[in-house]
């Protein structure tokens, strides 16, 4: 998930308030090492219901490790039906803990910036 590649797909979810309307988000994702770096420290999840970008920080190895650790924790959002906000918050906290737990003897500690959306099936209807 960290090397340059593309992901394209579609997802569906039931819309209880309007049985004839089913949201079908279309999505794509890609990452690229760019011109300045030799190692890609970025990654993403693009599997419904989670669409998340992670930007690793802390130098080549540290940034890459941080991205992998964060994506490892956040990956649980792709295998479940999200029915409450706490599930997302707890998963992001687990990702932060996974990054913090990475040992580092370098000048810069590993870190990661996480941004994304999760399609949640709340009692009042689907929401991002």
Sequence positions of predicted segments:
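PP2C/PPM-type serine/threonine phosphatase catalytic domain
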Residues: 1-128
């Amino acid at each position: 998930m960290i090397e340059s590649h593309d992901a394209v797909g579609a997802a569906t979810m039931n819309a209880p308030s309007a049985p004839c309307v089913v949201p079908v988000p279309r999505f794509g994702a890609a990452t690229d090492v760019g011109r300045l770096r030799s190692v890609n420290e970025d990654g993403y999840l693009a599997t419904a219901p989670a669409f998340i970008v992670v930007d690793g920080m802390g130098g080549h190895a540290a940034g890459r490790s941080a991205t992998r650790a964060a994506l490892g924790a956040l990956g649980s959002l792709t295998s479940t039906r999200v029915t409450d906000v706490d599930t997302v918050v707890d998963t992001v906290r687990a990702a932060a803990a996974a990054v913090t737990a990475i040992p580092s003897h370098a000048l810069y500690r590993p870190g990661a910036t996480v941004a994304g959306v999760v399609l949640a099936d709340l009692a009042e209807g689907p929401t991002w």
